[in-house]
Amino acid sequence: CAAVSDFICANPKDGKIKKDQMGDKIELKLNIDILKNLNLKCKKIGFKMEMDAKNALNNAKDMLKNKNLDAVCLNILGDDIKFGSNETKISFITKDTVMQTSLAQKEIIASQITKLAKNI
């Protein structure tokens, strides 16, 4: 799975855009919030990546509430967690608990998330 982008191209073009036809900027617009508008009767778990460790937990809790989620997997990028790394750690946040995983391979974290999700 991949995350849906928060932003999309404001003026998409068909085909390839050549470098010399590109210009010096790309205009973006806000994409539809699929998770917020999902009305299925299932467990809804959001994934949030933050770089601001100070506000990350509050931002994740706001996401949990505002999007009516069952849980949020919070990933904070920093010295030990880099974008594109094979290792990560997450905070699994529900309305009642915050559980922290240890730094591990992403496949192991995915398995842990699956187990945690079964208990909500």
Residue ranges and their predicted role:
Residues 1-81, 91:
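Glycine-rich phosphate/dinucleotide-binding loop and adjoining beta-alpha-beta core of small-molecule
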Residues 76-120:
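Small-residue (G/A/S/T)-rich helix-start motifs and N-terminal tracts that mark the onset
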